[in-house]
Structure formats: C-alpha cells, structure tokens
Amino acid sequence: MLRYTLRQLEYFVAVGQTGSIARAADKVNVSSPSISAAITQLEQEFGLPLFVRQHAQGLSLTLAGRQMMEQARVVLREADALTDLAGNISGTVRGPLAIGCLLSFAQLVLPALRRGFVTAYPDVRVRQIELNQAEIFSTLRRAEVDVALTYDLDLPRDLRFVPITELPPYVIVAETHPLAHLPSVTVEALAGHPMVLLDLPFSSEYFLSFFDRIGVRPHIAERTRDMAVMRSLVANGFGYSIANVQPLIAQSPDGKPLKFIPITGEVRPMRMGLLMSSDADRANVVRAFVEYCHGLKADGELPGQEAGE
C-alpha cells in the first residue's frame, strides 16, 4: 500500500528543480513547512536521503535523489495522462495545465488570458512560468510546461507552433522625442537616434534585423531584459525602443507618457501563438486552451491585440 501521494512527489520534484524549499514553495504555491514535511515523509518512506542540506547553498540532490526524481517525474506525467484520458472519455476539461509565456509580453497578456480561461474551465489547475525564448524551447522538451505563448522566433522543428494573431512592430518614444509627432516612422528615420534595446534571446535579433536589412547599425544606448524597465527608460528620454505588443495605457510604469508609432516599410510582423510538443493537444485541457485563445482572437478580445489592429 502506498504511503506517499502525488502531491508529495510534485513537491519533491519542485525542490529538485529549484534547489531551494522556499523557491519550490513559491513555484507550487504552498508554504515552506508543507514542502519540508513532504520531503521528510518521502525520505522516511523510501529509506533514502534525497537531498544534501547545505545551509549556504540550499539543497542538492543525492545520487539516489536524482534517480528518484527522474522516476517521480515519470509517475507525475503518467498521472496527468490518466487525468487526460478520463477527460477525453467523459468529454470534460479538468486537471493541471502548465503554461509558459514569453517574458517580453507576459505582463500584458498572460494574467487576463489565464483569468478568462480558469473562469471558463474552473476544474483546470493552471500554473504559469515566464521565460525567454530559449528557456521556452528547453522547458517544453523537458515536459515542464504543456504549452507556451510566444512568438514565431527561430522555432525548432521538433515543436509545433499554432499561430493565433499577427502583431506588426511599433516604435515607443517619449512625448518629447523628436519623432513623437509623426503618424508613422521608417527604420531609416530611427537610425540616427539612441535605442533602448529589449535584449532577450531571439527577440533582440529580430529587432536588429530591421537595421541589417538597410545596412545600418543602430545606436544602442541602453540594453535591458525587462519590458517595464525598457518603457521607463524610453519615457525618461534615454532613447526609443521597438516592441510588438502594446499596453492599453500609454504610459511607463513610473507614470510618464509614451507614444506608440507604427513602423512602415519592409519589416516582418511577429506572429504570436502557442508552442507545444507535436502531440500535446491530444490532452483535453491543452486542446481547450488552444480553442479558447482562438476564440479570443476571433472576438477581438486577445490581450495585446490592439497593436496589431
């Protein structure tokens, strides 16, 4: 008779992945004592030390712990598959759904999207994680997320992309910027002005490709990996930036006004969509999420869609 639960295995895997009880507690949204108790109970049940406790460095998996964690992940995947099978047979949508989202637009798109989905499907337990493009690829391959909301940037062949909407690029400037009065702007017009580059894997290459096409190097004055920091730098006069998803409110996080100007000329729009493994939508919950996103696009209610209209 089993004396441990799937929940305890989930906590064990979370600690193994993060190397910290506190970070694992944040990841699975429970208290640290609950995580500690689960690990202690599993070690007692298995008769094995799963972790080496190092006060300065957190927890490290023992050799036995690494082997047990790999098997625990298999058990959890099989349990999810059993839930999916039950849903497919009954036609219900329920169970866990791990959603990855690209860092550059997660704050603008994911919370409202998630709220609407869990309202429509209250029996689904959603977990979200914000990632850069390279991390999205790796977490999908490791089955740490079921589906990821991202752009069609350098997509690998072993993952399947379902496009949802197309978002042309636009320039972000402060109201006092010399280009702020223009109804549209060309890449050539940007070349002589300082740029605040959103410096994320694959995203930065996309933005810089606009200048490669015309044989010009942009004047990169600032680099940041954070969308909110980028908007604040722009609003405070450090330069212009480029993005594809537009916030509803035309101001920076520190309250200063911004202008959003479409870019004209030969610039490739970005396609936002859902990236997943080739067979991911065999699960009812993933298929329901894909259909839900398509429905929002059709109704003109997809967050961030305003920039592409």
Residue ranges and their predicted role:
Residues R94-R157, T224:
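Central regulatory/effector-binding core of bacterial HTH transcription factors
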Residues V13-S31:
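Short helix-boundary/capping micro-motifs
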Residues P194-I214, I249, R282-Y292, D299-Q305:
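Secondary-structure junction motif
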Residues E45-F46, M68-S90:
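Alpha-helical linker/hinge and terminal dimerization helices associated
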Residues N132-F137, R141-V145, T150-Y151, F202-I261:
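Hydrophobic hinge/microswitch elements
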Residues Q57, L63, G87-A106, A120-V124, ...:
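Interdomain hinge and pocket-entrance segments immediately C-terminal to HTH DNA-binding domains
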